[in-house]
Amino acid sequence: MWAAWCPEKGDNMLDNWNRPKRPVDAEIDEGVEEAKKRLADIQIQVKEKKLPVLVVLEGWDAAGKGSVLGKVIKDLDPRFFDVRTMDKPSEEELRRPFLYKYFAQLPEAGKFMFLEGGWMDELNSQLLHGKISEDEYERGIRSVECFERQLADNG
C-alpha cells in the first residue's frame, strides 16, 4: 500500500487561487457567433488587399480545436481559405528542415490558411516525448524565431 504526501491546508500556494468559472454554453456560442461575423468581414478585406493570413490553432489533444475550427469557418467563403491538420511528420518531412512542412502550407495572397496544430506544439511534443535533445529544442526555438520574423516582415 502506498501513500502520497499532500500539503496541509494553507501550505499550498494554490489555496488562495480563485478558479475562474467556466462560461455557460450560451456565452460560448455567443462569442463564437461574434467571432464568425468579424472573421467574415476580415475575409473580405484580406481578399481585397491580397493579404496572406495564417491562423494556427494549438492546444491539448482532444481539447476541441477541430470542432471550434468547424464552427468558425462554417460561414466563410470556401474559395478563400484552406484547412490543414498538422499531423506527426511524415518520413519525407523528417528528412527535411523542421519547419519545411509549415513553409509549404503558407497561404497565397488573399487567402486564409487554418492550421490545426503548429510548430510550437510539434517542437514541445518532440521534447516531451524524448525525440529531441535540449540542444535540438533550443535550435528549434531559434528556427521558430527566424520563421516568425520572416512571416511578420514579409506579410
Predicted regions and their residues:
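Glycine-rich phosphate-binding loop of ATP-dependent small-molecule kinases
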Residues: 2-155
